[in-house]
């Protein structure tokens, strides 16, 4: 892979797409993971308004720290980048309490709640996208999202554009290094951020949920 050529191609594609859509820029959900770090760094390079949202829902401290540090880093490097923290934990907990059912009768409850987290974040991204005239920019890659379908319908799969949809996971790691994404993010164990120890089930890794290995 010609790394710099790929970076330039995606950056120009993003810019052209936004101009064609008459959008002012991009909004990206930043989780502290490798995919969102790469997408946000690519969006930042366009020079267009780039809003980075951190949307914790019972998130682990290390995930929050990585996301915040990544946003701060891009803000220091690019004048067009702004960051916002929207703590969705209270909203999610109120929703979970409102729709609560007996898990013995509804064994899919925990999975449904996990997917609800992703859908709540999607709603938040589109809210901020619409009031700011920004495109909701997806972080799905060729293998997980557009290969095996490892995403939440109308959740993280609900986006306007998907700039890394054609990239394999190994290629994303290569781009991350070239884009100066922090080593803490590049070395972090992949997670979808939809499960936690507050739920009955232990947090499954993407590998556990898909039955396949990450690079």
Give residue ranges: language-model regions:
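Generic structural signal for individual residues within well-ordered alpha-helical segments
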Residues: 7-8, 173, 210
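Conserved small/polar residues in nucleotide/adenosyl-binding loops
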Residues: 201-208
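Hydrophobic alpha-helical segments, chiefly the membrane-spanning helices
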Residues: 212-215
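ATP-dependent adenylation/nucleotidyltransferase module used to activate substrates
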Residues: 1-150
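Catalytic subdomain that performs nucleotidyl-dependent activation
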Residues: 113, 135-200
């Amino acid at each position: 892979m010609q790394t710099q050529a790929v970076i330039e191609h995606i950056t120009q594609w993003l810019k052209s797409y936004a101009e064609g859509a008459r959008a002012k820029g991009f909004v990206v959900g930043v989780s502290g993971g490798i995919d969102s770090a790469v997408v946000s760094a690519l969006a930042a390079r366009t020079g267009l308004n780039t809003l980075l949202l951190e949307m914790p829902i019972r998130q682990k401290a290390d995930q929050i720290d990585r996301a915040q540090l990544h946003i701060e880093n891009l803000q220091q490097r690019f004048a067009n980048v702004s960051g916002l923290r929207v703590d969705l934990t209270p909203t999610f907990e109120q929703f979970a309490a409102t729709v609560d059912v007996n898990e013995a009768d509804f064994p899919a409850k925990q999975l449904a709640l996990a997917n609800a987290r992703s859908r709540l974040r999607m709603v938040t991204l589109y809210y901020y996208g619409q009031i700011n005239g920004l495109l909701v920019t997806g972080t799905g890659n060729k293998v997980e999202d557009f290969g095996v379908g490892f995403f939440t319908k109308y959740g993280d799969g609900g986006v306007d554009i998907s700039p890394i949809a054609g990239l394999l996971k190994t290629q994303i790691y290569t781009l991350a290094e070239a884009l100066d994404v922090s080593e803490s993010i590049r070395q972090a164990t992949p997670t979808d951020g939809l499960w936690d120890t507050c739920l009955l089930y232990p947090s499954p890794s993407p590998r556990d949920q898909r039955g396949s290995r990450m690079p």
